[in-house]
Regions:
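Non-catalytic interaction/Regulatory regions outside core domains
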Residues: 1-125
């Protein structure tokens, strides 16, 4: 996926209020593209996040906060920060085998599983 396509996906995700940050990771967990540098995701954090997804761990860490993984399969991820109110993580594998991951604000018009489905739909569009 090239940067122009990534930016198109970010625009599609931003059609709904609440997307705080979007990342594209490759299969090794390296950051290919990111939508902002406000709260930068480190390479180590990206690799740990992808490892938690692939190995179906019960939780993941993002920006030093724990997110309970509520949905975790080969193509979709949905995780919620329950205790700290830090929002949600929704992700999907893309057609080319990369991983599109969005950090979502805690209060939006959609619930987490709807976000997970939406991120998947955008990733496969």
């Amino acid at each position: 996926m090239d940067e122009q396509r990534f930016n198109q996906l970010v625009e599609q995700l931003n059609e709904y209020e609440g997307v705080e940050e979007v990342f594209l990771l490759n299969n090794e967990g390296e950051i290919v593209f990111k939508s902002t540098s406000i709260a930068p995701l480190t390479v180590e954090e990206a690799k740990a996040l992808l490892r938690a997804w692939k190995e179906k761990e019960p939780s993941l860490n993002y920006q030093n906060s724990r997110y309970a993984i509520l949905k975790n399969d080969d193509i979709q991820l949905a995780a919620k920060n329950i205790a700290g109110g830090k929002g949600n993580i929704a992700g999907s594998i893309t057609k080319d085998g990369n991983y599109l991951i969005a950090h979502i604000a805690p209060d939006t018009g959609m619930i987490l599983l709807e976000w997970s489905i939406f991120v998947n739909k955008v990733a496969w569009s």
